[in-house]
Amino acid sequence: ELTYIVDSTAAPVCVLIPISTWAVFASRLLVTNGVTTEGESLKYFIKTIPYNFYAWAALIIVLLLILRVIPPLGRMKVATERVENGGPLAPAGSEKIDIRGNSKNAEPQTHGKMIDFALPIACLILSTILCDVDMQKGVIITLGFMFVLYVSRGLISASDFADCCVEGIKNMLLPLIMMVLAFLFSYASNRIQFTKTIIDTVFPFMQNIPQLMPLFIFIILGITEFITGTNWGLYIIALPIVIPLSAAIGANTLLCISAVLSAGVFGSHICFYSDATIISSSACGCDNFEHGLSQMPYGF
């Protein structure tokens, strides 16, 4: 349930916030495809926010689940009953993808302060920006900063700090492998033009029903996203086709663009091997496949 909440407040929230990377990326594509001008792209993106119905629905449903207006369903119900009966929090096999590793079993430390958490985060943000938004350099600088901050104050020994770094890399290995395989599958789907083939095959039949084009866009692209998990790749492929086609047959271009954005969010949220699904599972210590199955009733 925790993994579902985290996953449902990731991509759905990003596409509703004008300052997110999703907004910047989509706005740039709108300029590239001639929908709006450079200075007006963000304003046009903001117009799509009220019509991004899947993102809104995902947030509303997760809130209703938290408040128990909507009860746990399917595998989530089974998991809830397991925990209530004294069983383990995570399903079997979750330890393989849990990036928290052995930290859950570690002895609690009482001498840490909030500043020990806040300063490294601030250092990571600042160093990444100063290094031309190079996250790799930012992480290396932050690790050095943390070493000085913690070891000099006796919070941790130098050898324990090194052990923590190695253990962290080991815990991230399986999620990273899954991410690489997911990107490989997405790349292969793009190379064979899977999404474009589906669009070219189905969309010509919409010429006589332009009012229903946004609905068909979401359904068709949602299915392809569930299969491929391309997320932003969908926008690159679909928007150059959807925008001129919607204008040509008299469909509402704004609604059609919103439907494309919604389909991308749907794929990021529901696809078993999308980056958001894998990272959410890893962060919460839940088996990726179990998480994907348990959130399906709510996503669909």
Role assignments for model-derived ranges:
Residues 1, 17-35, 233-244, 261, ...:
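Re-entrant/interfacial helical elements at transmembrane boundaries that shape
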Residues 1-9, 38-46, 250-255, 284-299:
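Membrane-interface alpha-helices at helix entry/exit sites of multi-pass transporters
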Residues 1-6, 179-180, 209-244, 248-249, ...:
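Hydrophobic alpha-helical transmembrane segments of multi-pass integral membrane proteins
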Residues 3-20, 52-55, 182-190, 224-230, ...:
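Helix-loop-helix module between adjacent transmembrane segments
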Residues 4, 44-47, 160-171, 197-207, ...:
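Short amphipathic alpha-helical coupling elements at transmembrane boundaries
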Residues 36, 41-45, 58-131, 139-164, ...:
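Long, contiguous bundles of hydrophobic transmembrane helices that form the permeation core
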Residues 51-55, 108-120, 137, 166-179, ...:
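Helical membrane-embedded segments and adjacent short helical loop/helix-boundary regions
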Residues 129-152, 159-196, 211-223, 227:
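Core transmembrane alpha-helical segments of multi-pass membrane transporters/permeases
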